[in-house]
A protein has these predicted regions:
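Receiver (REC) domain active-site loop signature in two-component systems and cognate sites
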Residues: 60
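Helix N-cap/capping motif at the beta->alpha junctions
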Residues: 35-44, 65
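Active-site residues of response regulator receiver
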Residues: 57, 87
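Short amphipathic alpha-helix used as the core "switch/output" element in two-component signaling
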Residues: 44, 66-79
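Two-component/phosphorelay signaling modules centered on CheY-like receiver
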Residues: 13-34, 123
Length: 127
């Protein structure tokens, strides 16, 4: 797989590192990792840099992951870029809401590198 740039949006710096490690363990060749601590920071990052994959938490201060997703989709900041939501939210309504907002994948915390691989790799192949 070719090198990719990933934007990881989560209000926990520890979780951002865990997600990065899981992506690497899943076999992704990450050339660059852009980190954002809120949806607002993620939105700003995409105004200046292009990502090949976006991984975002849902529950964050300032701008949650769903609003972040809606805004990047409506502004055309991530056309054709797969977005995967990683969150502790377990209800099916959260999955439906994320998919309706424009996410292509949804992973519940806690997760394994295998779960990340199984949900992310097909999205990158089809992107």
């Amino acid at each position: 797989m070719s090198e990719i740039t990933v934007l990881i949006v989560d209000d926990s710096s520890v979780m951002r590192k865990i997600v990065e490690r899981a992506l690497r363990q899943a076999g992704l060749n990450l050339s660059r990792v852009i980190e954002a601590g809120s949806g607002r920071e993620g939105l700003e990052a995409l105004r200046h840099e292009k990502a090949d994959l976006i991984v975002s938490d849902i529950n964050m201060p300032n701008m949650d992951g769903l609003e972040f997703l809606r805004q990047i989709r409506s502004a055309g900041l991530a056309e054709g870029v797969p977005v995967v939501m990683i969150t502790t939210e377990s209800g099916e309504e959260h999955v439906r809401e994320a998919l309706a907002a424009g996410a292509q994948g949804y992973i519940r915390k806690p997760f394994t590198p295998d779960q990340v691989r199984d949900r992310v790799l097909p999205l990158l192949v089809s992107a």
